A protein has these predicted regions:
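Helix-to-loop junctions at the C-terminal end of transmembrane segments
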Residues: 1-13, 223-235, 320-321
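Hydrophobic core of transmembrane alpha-helices in multi-pass small-molecule transporters
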Residues: 28, 39-56, 182, 262-276
Length: 381
């Protein structure tokens, strides 16, 4: 559903997409209370996968900040992506509290109503496709200053040129980035889902492993937030490359983690890498291909990322069953991360579209100047 949702996002904005995703996911979570057959469980998770916030539905939360901000895009993504880690820090222990007090079946229902109760009203009240829809400008720029400078002046400074999805798929960077993120995801998932049981099999205290897991989520938030704050001073490619290397080093540390401290710091570094990469994926597509058709472009890429990455966990599990060791799968994951890093490094910014470029500064002057309204107030909602 990624390409479909991406096009809807560019055309209509995130409001109803996010509301629909929240309601459908919430109803599926309630349905989990009543499942008793395997086909019911598979069906519910398939539906959640089609619209869920960790899949195509996540476009509705990652694309809008890139449309509302250009100069301050990194900072906006820093704040928005940090919310993912904050949610993990809050809801993982809260879920355990619900399970201990009400059983896991009732916990699904409680979490469903909490999610819908937060997401639906906030989406209806505050989400708008892009600032021009409200007569505003990205980054809170003043309309009068832009109009006084004239279109030519805008074309020479502060310009962001946007590619269409059809133009983007003809470029080399589109596919090297797609390959880099897909292979990285494959490498990550050979490790991420198996490291917890592996650490416990090595005799590490489960309570200490859970502590390190929680700290992993904290470090992911720190990584995404720090990357967003630094991206105006450090090129995005360097920040992104550091994420690949952090994940590879953390994976090597995990292979040798037979004591608490090495396990703890491997989880911390892994979290930093995950958070930095999470920011990088949200930022780099807008930097390379502009904001106008970002939903459509990322909608094409996301199913590929999810499909290839999804092979990692079952493949690693199969290797463990065959060999009795996690090491072969994990070393393969490290190699995949390094290959992905090379692909990312060779993915250069494609520059301007060659055929019929869509030229867009941070300021869509035609839509604002012809609106017949004085929008000197400027700003971001």
């Amino acid at each position: 559903t990624g390409p479909f949702i991406g096009r809807l996002l560019d055309r209509y904005g995130p409001k109803w997409i996010l509301v629909s995703a929240a309601v459908i996911t919430g109803l599926c979570m309630i349905g989990l209370k009543y499942t008793s057959l395997s086909w019911q469980l598979i069906t519910i998770f398939a539906v959640m996968g089609l619209v869920g916030m960790s899949g195509p539905g996540s476009l509705a939360t990652s694309v809008p900040p890139t449309k509302w901000f250009v100069k301050n895009r990194g900072k906006a993504l820093a704040y928005s992506s940090a919310g993912i880690s904050a949610g993990a820090v809050v809801f993982v222990p809260l879920t355990q509290v619900f399970i201990d007090k009400y059983t896991w079946q009732e916990s699904w229902v409680i979490l469903a109503f909490i999610g819908m109760g937060i997401i639906v009203p906030l989406s209806l009240l505050f989400l708008v496709r892009e600032p021009e829809d409200m007569g505003l400008l990205p980054d809170g720029e003043k309309t009068s200053k832009i109009l006084e400078s004239g279109k030519e002046g805008i074309h020479l400074s502060g310009i962001e040129k946007s590619w269409t999805a059809r133009e983007a798929i003809r470029t080399f960077p589109m596919w090297t980035l797609t390959a880099a993120f897909s292979i990285l995801s494959l490498g990550i998932l050979t490790l991420a889902l198996h490291r917890i049981p592996a650490f416990m099999d090595r005799g590490l205290d489960p309570s200490l492993v859970s502590l390190a897991t929680a700290f992993d989520a904290v470090c992911a938030g720190v990584g995404s937030f720090t990357a967003g704050m630094l991206v105006r001073k450090i090129p995005a490619k360097i920040i992104g490359s550091s994420a690949f290397l952090m994940l590879a080093v953390a994976s090597v540390m995990s292979i040798y983690a037979y004591d608490f401290w090495l396990m703890f710091w491997s989880m911390a570094l892994f979290g930093l890498g995950i958070g930095t990469n999470m920011f990088n994926q949200n930022y780099i597509w807008a930097e390379y291909f502009g904001r106008t058709n970002l939903g459509s472009i990322r909608g094409i890429v996301m199913p590929i990322n999810l499909f290839i990455g999804g092979l990692g966990a079952p493949a690693a599990g199969y290797v463990v069953d065959m060999t009795g060791s996690y090491d072969p799968a994990w070393w393969t994951g490290v190699a995949l991360m390094l290959v992905a890093a090379v692909l990312f490094v060779v993915s250069n910014n494609p520059g301007e579209p060659q055929a019929e470029p869509i030229v867009e500064s941070p300021y869509n002057v035609d839509r604002i100047s012809n609106s017949g309204t004085d929008y000197n107030q400027g700003g971001i909602v």
